[in-house]
From Swiss-Prot:
The lineage of its organism: Eukaryota, Sar, Alveolata, Ciliophora, Intramacronucleata. GO terms for molecular function: DNA binding; protein heterodimerization activity; structural constituent of chromatin. The modification N6-acetyllysine is found at residues 5, 10, 15, 19, 24, 28, 37, 57. GO terms for cellular component: nucleosome; nucleus. The modification N6,N6-dimethyllysine is found at residues 5, 28, 37. The modification Phosphoserine is found at residue 11. Residues 1-43 are annotated as: Disordered. The modification N6,N6,N6-trimethyllysine is found at residues 5, 10, 28, 37. Induction: Highly expressed in growing cells, but only at low levels in starved cells. Keywords: Acetylation, Chromosome, DNA-binding, Methylation, Nucleosome core, Nucleus, Phosphoprotein. Belongs to the histone H3 family. This is Histone H3. The modification N6-methyllysine is found at residues 5, 28, 37, 57, 80. PANTHER family: HISTONE H3.
């Protein structure tokens, strides 16, 4: 049987309620909600830092395989109608695409930091691509 948390209940004793001090009355102005507890929330940025550490540790692919495969086939269909792909070829394309995106986001983050910001913007990505010598 699972343990349950016991909450304190008001007694129905014979003593009459005493007058509360002003400071105590101000503290207890919000009515008790019958033991309903607010869900725990981390401070802003804590979860983001945890996710950064998690994804920097991992080596697995971050983009789902089937949507990426559909995208590759859709782009290839514009050039030639009857193209077939080995699964290893799609996997190699996905590895290369994710490596490119990670590098681009690293450079974009450096551009945002250079502008004394922590939030990346479109102009940071455009600057990173321009410095790399890519056309956009």
């Amino acid at each position: 049987m699972a343990r349950t948390k016991q909450t304190a209940r008001k007694s129905t004793g014979a003593k009459a309620p005493r007058k509360q001090l002003a400071s105590k009355a101000a503290r207890k102005s919000a009515p008790a909600t019958g033991g309903i507890k607010k869900p725990h929330r981390f401070r802003p940025g804590t979860v983001a830092l945890r996710e950064i550490r998690k994804y920097q540790k991992s080596t697995d692919l971050l983009i789902r395989k089937l949507p990426f495969q559909r995208l590759v086939r859709d782009i290839a269909h514009e050039f030639k109608a009857e193209l077939r792909f080995q699964s290893s070829a799609v996997l190699a394309l996905q590895e290369a695409a994710e490596a490119y995106l990670v590098g681009l986001f690293e450079d974009t983050n450096l551009c945002a930091i250079h502008a004394r910001r922590v939030t990346i913007m479109t102009k940071d990505m455009q600057l990173a691509r321009r410095i790399r010598g890519e056309r956009f």
